[in-house]
Regions:
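S-adenosyl-L-methionine
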Residues: 110-152
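A short acidic (Asp/Glu
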Residues: 79-86, 104-106, 154
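Short, solvent-exposed loop/turn segments at secondary-structure junctions
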Residues: 76-78, 98-100, 148-149
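Long, hydrophobic, well-ordered secondary-structure blocks that form the structural core
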Residues: 91-116
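Conserved alpha-helix/loop element of class I SAM-dependent methyltransferases that forms part
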Residues: 46-69, 80-81
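Membrane-proximal basic amphipathic "stem/tether" segments
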Residues: 1-41
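Donor nucleotide-activated moiety binding/catalytic core segment of transferases
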Residues: 55-64, 142, 146-155
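Conserved class I S-adenosyl-L-methionine
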Residues: 65-77, 85, 93-96
Length: 155
C-alpha cells in the first residue's frame, strides 16, 4: 500500500514527509518495517552483487582480489559486501554511522546460494545465527560508530 502511494507522490513531498517523520521517537528499524525508510537495496542478493561488480570493475581490481581488503563506507541495510568479498578471497571492512544492517540471516544465505551458482566459493554461514557469526566466517568488520570507527580501521 505504501509503495503505491510513494510512487504517486512528487519527490519534494517525500523529502518533507521524511523530515517530519524523522522527528518521531520511532527507531530506524520500525520505519524500515513500515517500508518508509530504507538505506538502499543491498539486502537483495542480485542487486548487491551488481553493485559490487560495478565498483570493482571501475576500481581496476576485478581480476586480482587475493589478499585485498575492501573498505565500504555506508553499507546501509546489509553486510553483503563482506560475503561477496570473502567469495573472492578478500575481506571487507564496513563503516557506517549506526548498526543498520538487517539481522535476518536469510538474505545472506540467499546471497551465498547465488554466489555458489556463479562458480564462486562463498563462506560457510549456514549455521550462522547472528551478524557476528557471519562477520567471523568472512573475516570481516562492521564498524558502526561513524567517524569514531575510522580510528579502528587498520591500514
Amino acid at each position: 500500500m505504501f509503495t503505491k502511494i510513494k510512487r504517486r507522490l512528487p519527490w519534494w513531498t517525500k523529502i518533507v514527509a521524511k523530515l517530519v517523520l524523522s522527528r518521531s521517537p520511532l527507531s530506524y528499524s520500525d520505519w524500515q518495517k513500515l517500508a518508509l525508510f530504507r538505506h538502499g537495496y543491498m539486502h537483495d542478493p542480485g542487486y548487491a552483487l551488481g553493485v559490487f561488480d560495478t565498483h570493482v570493475t571501475r576500481s581496476g581490481i576485478r581480476e586480482n582480489f587475493h589478499g585485498k581488503t575492501i573498505l565500504e563506507i555506508g553499507p546501509g541495510d546489509s553486510i553483503a559486501t563482506t560475503i561477496i568479498s570473502r567469495s573472492h578471497d578478500a575481506r571487507a571492512i564496513l563503516v557506517d554511522i549506526g548498526p543498520f544492517a538487517t539481522e535476518d540471516t536469510l538474505p545472506y544465505l540467499a546471497l551465498c546460494e547465488l554466489l555458489g551458482k556463479q562458480g564462486l566459493k562463498p563462506p560457510e554461514i549456514s549455521s550462522a545465527h547472528t551478524l557476528e557469526d557471519i562477520l567471523l566466517a568472512c573475516d570481516g568488520e562492521y564498524l558502526t560508530e561513524g567517524l569514531t570507527s575510522w580510528k579502528q580501521v587498520s591500514s
